[in-house]
Amino acid sequence: MANLSYKGFTIGVEEEYMVIDPVTRELKSHEQKIVHEGQKLIKDKVKAEMHQAVVEVGTDICQDIDEAFMDVSTLRKTISGIGESLGLKLGASGTHPFSHWESQLITDHVRYSEIVNELQEAARSNLIFGLHVHVGMENREMAIHIANSARYFLPHVYALSTNSPFWEGRTTGYKSFRTKVFDKFPRTGIPDYFESIEAYENYVKLLVKTNCIDNAKKIWWDLRVHPFFNTVEFRICDIPMTVQETIAIAALFQALCAKLYKLRSQNLNFMTYSRALINENKWRASRYGIDGSMIDFGKETEVNTRVLIYELLDFIDDVVPQLGSRHAVNYVHNMLEQGTGADRQLKVYEQTNSLVDVVDYIHGNFLTGI
């Protein structure tokens, strides 16, 4: 076991940013000006999203967490600079504090037209901003095994990412309202357990055959085996406010995959739980963030969420040194101390009673730590 290598657990990070009008602080439909200018500098690492007020960026395949940090930092600086040159601001929050989706324009693209035509108001109202983390796998069989076990930990990491307490000018009472918005889509949420990659692929084939989807990219679960790459894609998290938070979360997902791989290599398996049970913890994470409690299914008892996150850190600790991600994983302690993005947004609002000030705070932290 001493020779076990984790070099195959590469990292890819996708972030979705909000485009902000510097005067009104509303979301700004910008006709893809940032995307067009960005593609001159970073090519296909910047993409349009369904709403014009959203810009999506994606890193290269990163060999370790330091490379991912540099790539995400460069992307944030580049997009921020382009936005500034166009008289626009950027920010990272799972929802905009007060802009209404009805005022935002849909990007003119055949894929988005198809989605809107099928999903109607569910698609038009899906004005949200997420973080996706890809972790490389040696093969798809290993990917489905790791995905099955990793489902249990999704609410733990999601709680750390919560960064969407407001929706259309209202305090929602949730630390992450983003997933409540996204739940209107089909094929979302915690995935089922699949016995094998063949079982998963048969499921996909059935959906394609019966005209539910045209390809597996329209399976929008919180965690999925990517349809085209040998990766496990973690999709549950709100976009974090800062790059350090994004990288800490990416490091957690990478280490979790490595730990589950290590157990598999020792002919050990982590207990798998039903979607129904995991959904209970997901709801708690959405509502309370890191300040609530979750269910420890093994002990059949409630446990403080922070305690469970510390237990997750202990669980992955033995693989962190070989991954070279100690500093990134350790930043989770800062996140637990300073509160999540949602906690900080709510604190600003409590102090100022101004959602405009909340937007300014979000924008002001876009390049923090870079």
Placement of each model-derived feature along the sequence:
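Acidic, His- and aromatic-enriched active-site or binding-groove loops in soluble protein domains
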Residues: 109-130
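Short, glycine/charge-rich beta-strand/loop segments that flank catalytic centers
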Residues: 87-104, 168-172
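An acidic- and aromatic-residue-enriched active-site/binding cleft used to recognize and process polar
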Residues: 22, 88, 93-98, 131, ...
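An exposed, glycine/acidic-rich loop-and-rim segment of catalytic or binding clefts
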Residues: 139, 147-194
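Internal, well-ordered domain-core segments that constitute the primary functional module
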Residues: 124-150
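C-terminal accessory/tail domains of diverse enzymes
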Residues: 1-86, 115, 182-370
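Short, low-order "capping/linker" segments at domain edges
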Residues: 101-113, 173-186, 281-282
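Short secondary-structure capping/junction motifs at helix and strand boundaries
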Residues: 85-93, 141-145, 158-162
